[in-house]
Amino acid sequence: MTDEIGIVTPQKLHVSTPLEMVSGSTLPEYDLAYETYGSLNADKSNAILICHALSGNHHVAGQYEGESTRGWWDGYIGPGKPIDTNRFFVVCSNNLGGCHGSTGPASINPLTGKVYGPDFPIVTCKDWVHSQNTLRQHLEIDAWAAVIGGSMGGMQVLQWTIDFPDQIRHAIVIASAPKLSAQNIAFNEVARRAIMTDPDFHDGRFIEAGTTPKRGLALARMLGHLTYLSDDMMGSKFGRELREGKLNYNFDVEFQVESYLRYQGEKFATKQNFDANTYLLMTKALDYFDPAADFDDDLSKALSGATAKFLIISFTTDWRFSPERSHEIVKALLDNDADISYAEVNSQHGHDAFLLPNDHYEGVFRAYMKRIHAELNHTSLQEGE
């Protein structure tokens, strides 16, 4: 039986120890916004870390007081759900460089007394994982029972297995890739140019100028959203349906798919109030992710020290991070005789499928989480039901 997580309150960890970053820059101090769900058991062995994707944040489940919107993965986290909060203590933090409570471009730079803006240092998946490890230490958790993430979150999971192999028992990598393709880097560059050429961007100092590059953000989101959807899904959802039932022979919105994309862009740029500099940072972190680069471009070698057990999930119509990209990860793990489970899930929803309801996906996910719970309690899967 499933139930819902109720009202949640975000927490904040202030870290006064400087963070040495991959770029060579240093954050003198920083805040990490995070949320937790469920209860930590006596030996603190049931903790799960969720790593979010590009536009995500730490609000992964439940809802805030006075708000109706639920967390971005609420369908999969809660009592009786695949990530069962009756069994697990779930943690999710907002990535550094974000705009939802963790230190980012809109935060005050303690060295200048002004907002960081474009001066915020470039962040990488490795930087995020090292800050998340600081949160782990703060929570006095010896090791995560599992680290779980989809898309960019899956990249962080892989980085965890490389940088902190003794602190992660299971790694669940969903709809992800070991590095971006040239095409994906190109999509990110077009999105960045849309933002940076908006007259309201002001070289990233738009907060000081009292503006917001909404047009650029909306265009970037429209492009990104296109890559998250499959052709089949767009065809079945919109086809060539006209908004007014007839052609008007002008450049206003005529097709329903145009209306949908404009709505998604405007919502992201206005209602969600996403910081433009954060968007630039997140896309760059995606571009830079390539753990094999430090191991002679050999992914098998990069993952050779990983001791976690793995679940890798891909989706048939995901062309942003196609199943073939997951196969690369699977092969590298098999080269190392890793304990690995793999599922390729049928879905018409493209890359966004990892966020949406799907019986096959949920079944695989639920079964694997039951396995983790059974291992924690030293029981068989039947006893661990």
From Swiss-Prot:
Gene3D superfamilies: 1.10.1740.110, alpha/beta hydrolase
A single GO BP: homoserine metabolic process
Annotated active site: 151 (nucleophile), 318, 351
EC assignment: 2.3.1.46
GO CC aspect terms: cytoplasm
InterPro entries assigned to the protein according to its UniProt record, in alphabetical order: AB_hydrolase_1 (IPR000073), AB_hydrolase_fold (IPR029058), HAT_MetX-like (IPR008220)
Site (Important for acyl-CoA specificity): 320
Annotated substrate binding sites: 221, 352
Record keywords, A-Z: Acyltransferase, Amino-acid biosynthesis, Cytoplasm, Methionine biosynthesis, Transferase
Cellular localization per UniProt: Cytoplasm
Pathways per UniProt: Amino-acid biosynthesis; L-methionine biosynthesis via de novo pathway; O-succinyl-L-homoserine from L-homoserine: step 1/1
Cytoplasm found in the keyword field: yes
AB hydrolase-1 domain ranges (all copies): 46-355
Catalysis: reaction(s): L-homoserine + succinyl-CoA = O-succinyl-L-homoserine + CoA
MF term (GO), any: homoserine O-succinyltransferase activity
Pfam families according to UniProt: Abhydrolase_1
NCBIfam families, per the entry: homoserO_Ac_trn, PRK00175.1
Function text: Transfers a succinyl group from succinyl-CoA to L-homoserine, forming succinyl-L-homoserine.
Family: Belongs to the AB hydrolase superfamily. MetX family.
Subunit and interaction comment: Homodimer.
Protein name: Homoserine O-succinyltransferase
Organism whose genome encodes this protein: Hydrogenovibrio crunogenus (strain DSM 25203 / XCL-2) (Thiomicrospira crunogena)
